[in-house]
């Protein structure tokens, strides 16, 4: 296999962008494991008392990820996130203002392999979220297990990540002052198995939990489409029904996370590696769908609102797909 090496002479700014994405990839794929190893080493070293003190802190702080987390505007505004967003680049586009007196549930589509667009747009200020949506506080939902990892939990909470359990959503959407925006990758980990360049298959037809949540709390729904999200990595062919796909689906049910076999590019070559390819991501935030508070919604009400959400998502796709390199005759695939 021929390896396509990067040229030696490229602008220094591009080097900085690559370094920014490299640190993100390492932290996303290996930081949790390193933090666990560090804690164990600390526990069995002469500094064991520090591990013990942190263990006490962890016990006392256990519920924080389900109570709004502990965001840090300083961390969200690090210059590294500006270079991170410029690498692809990632662009956040607002199609309608969102009144901060309401709470919102933003349905993010598609999940992609590593949810790059959601992280860049809602966990950092690299694309100017606070400027585009003044008064709103974004919270990207993440699997609860990651918030049990020592040290790592502090880092991810600083970027506005919160636990995806029900109590976490209930806490944020119950804030009467408004201005809370929950960002949910609706397709979840299973959708990562369909993340392939040029394809856009969304697992949405049977996803109604976020709809019920919106009705229960009267949170307005906002469809969000991230064009280009699936183009960042190549994935081993895994059609539904194949041995590989069946194995991946079984492991996902057991582990709670998807295990797509993917590759991108390297630091000094473009042929293979764990860095995402430099391909643009355009994250389009649609118009809000007003939702009246219904503490005990019926199945009919849930189905009706779900159908409206799907229709608005299709409309968003149809309106914008031609602007971002998608053939106008290509339809959105929902399953």
From Swiss-Prot:
Localization of this protein: Endoplasmic reticulum membrane; Cytoplasm, Perinuclear region
Molecular function per GO: 2-acylglycerol O-acyltransferase activity; diacylglycerol O-acyltransferase activity
Family per record: Belongs to the diacylglycerol acyltransferase family.
EC number of this enzyme: 2.3.1.20, 2.3.1.22
Annotated organism of origin: Xenopus laevis (African clawed frog)
Pathway involvement of the protein, from the record: Glycerolipid metabolism; triacylglycerol biosynthesis
Protein name stated in the entry: 2-acylglycerol O-acyltransferase 2-B
Membrane-spanning ranges: 24-44, 104-124
Domain of life: Eukaryota
Keyword vocabulary terms for this entry: Acyltransferase, Cytoplasm, Endoplasmic reticulum, Glycerol metabolism, Glycoprotein, Lipid biosynthesis, Lipid metabolism, Membrane, Transferase, Transmembrane, Transmembrane helix
Glycosylation sites: 206
Principal localisation: endoplasmic reticulum
GO CC annotation: endoplasmic reticulum membrane; perinuclear endoplasmic reticulum membrane
Recorded name of the encoding gene: mogat2-b
Pfam families: DAGAT (PF03982)
Catalytic activity: a 2-acylglycerol + an acyl-CoA = a 1,2-diacylglycerol + CoA; a 2-acylglycerol + an acyl-CoA = a 1,2-diacyl-sn-glycerol + CoA; a 2-acylglycerol + an acyl-CoA = a 2,3-diacyl-sn-glycerol + CoA; a 1-acylglycerol + an acyl-CoA = a 1,2-diacylglycerol + CoA
Catalytic EC class: transferase
Single Gene Ontology BP annotation: glycerol metabolic process
Reported function: Catalyzes the formation of diacylglycerol from 2-monoacylglycerol and fatty acyl-CoA.
Membrane association type: Multi-pass membrane protein
